[in-house]
Regions:
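Catalytic Cys-His active-site segments of thiol-dependent hydrolases/isopeptidases
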Residues: 120
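A conserved non-catalytic segment of reverse transcriptases
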Residues: 123-159
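Conserved polymerase palm-domain catalytic core
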Residues: 1-95, 99-117, 125-137
Length: 159
């Protein structure tokens, strides 16, 4: 945040959350993503067994360790899009929660529009209504912390 302040003065924060993320992961899309990186048929067989051992057609079980790995693999697609196609340098994600720091409100609105489109068309995901754009002065709640340019504070549980 300090880098953004030094570079731009005032800036905007785009905070995003994916709606019902684990429930909405498309296993077919996930498998295609994995198949682009892994070519070994035995490993792919094992991955398919793990994925489809869960009886659900769509979505992953939250408590399963492999689900956490698969969920990160799935969202790596949006990571790459944001960093390399949109060229947004200040982007941070933990599972389905992410924050982006952008120079202007217009930049934030435009980025949000493109990200929504990419998520819907490529990953069949939508952003939660909690998604918001706000000025840097407020700081941001992220991963259990209240973060601003001067400090990092553990957030109260009620907030």
């Amino acid at each position: 945040m300090r880098k953004c302040k030094n570079k731009w003065g005032n800036y905007y924060i785009l905070k995003m959350d994916i709606a019902k993320y684990f429930d909405n992961i498309n296993k077919k899309i996930l498998l295609k993503i994995i198949e682009r990186k892994i070519k070994d048929k035995n490993i792919l067989w094992l991955i398919k067994e793990i994925l489809y051992a869960q009886k659900r057609e769509k979505g992953l079980e939250i408590g399963n360790y492999t689900s956490q790995i698969f969920a990160n693999i799935y969202l790596n697609e949006i990571d790459q899009y944001i960093k390399h196609k949109l060229k947004i340098r200040y982007y941070f994600r933990y599972m389905d929660d992410s924050i982006l720091f952008l120079q202007t409100k217009r930049d934030a609105i435009e980025a949000l529009k493109k990200i929504k489109k990419y998520l819907k068309e490529n990953l069949e995901l939508e952003l939660n209504k909690k998604t918001q754009i706000f000025k840097d002065k407020q700081g941001v709640n992220f991963c259990g912390y209240k973060i601003n340019e001067n400090r990092l504070k553990i957030r109260d549980k009620g907030k």
